C-alpha cells in the first residue's frame, strides 16, 4: 500500500511510513505475526468470514479486530508486498493526529478488552509473545522517550548556554552565545534516537525493495526523520488519555 501522489512534506512523511509498513508486514507474515489487515485491498476467504461471523463494530478499528479474530481462530494471514494499491492520506497535522489517534486507541481497546488472552500466550506464537507486547512497549516507550527527551534537551540547552556564556578570556561581562561542536552532549537518549532512526530508514529501504517501488524516497525519508518524532507523541499521548478516561471520538 502506497500514498497516492504525495506532495507536501507531511504527505511525504506518511509515504515513508507506509513503505516502512510494507517491510514490517513482510517480516511479520513470515512468522504469522500480522495483527491488522489494512482496509484497502485486503482479501478474505468467504468461508472464513462466514465461520467467524463477519465484521462487527470494534472501536473504529474493524480491520484490526478481524485480523486478531482470524489469528485467534488458528488461521494464517499472508502478505503480498508487491500488490499495488494506493491510499490518500491526511493533508494537515490535526487530521493526521485524529486518524492516528483512532488507529492507536483501536489497537489498545481491542487488545486490552476482547483479545487480551492473546497477549503473552505461547499458543499464538510470535503474535502473542512478541508482536502484541511490543505494540504496547512502543506506545508507552514512545511517550516516555518524548518526555525524557524534552527534559534532557532543556537541561542540555541551559548547560550549553551557561558554558558558552563564560567570562574566561573575554573582555566583556555580557553573555555571549556561540555554537561549539565540543559542547554537543552524547546522551543515552541521543544514542537511542539515532539507532531507532537508522533502523527505521533501513526498514523503509527494505520496503522499497520488496514492493518494487521505483520513485525516489529522499524527500519522504527527510520528512519521516524530522517530522514524525515531532508529531507522533501527540497522538500517542492523546490515545492513552482517551483509553484511560473512556473518551470516544467521532470518525472524522
Question: Locations of the language-model features?
Answer:
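Catalytic donor-sugar/metal-binding loop of nucleotide-sugar-dependent glycosyltransferases
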Residues: 58, 67-86
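Active-site donor/metal-binding and catalytic loop motifs
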Residues: 3, 80-96
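Long helical/loop segments within the catalytic core of UDP-sugar-dependent glycosyltransferases
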Residues: 1-59, 101-108, 112
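Hydrophobic side chains within well-formed alpha-helices
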Residues: 9, 66, 93-96
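Hydrophobic, aromatic-rich membrane-embedded alpha-helical segments
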Residues: 222-240
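Basic/Trp-rich segment in TM-proximal cytosolic loops or flexible interdomain/linker regions
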Residues: 91-95, 99-222, 243-252
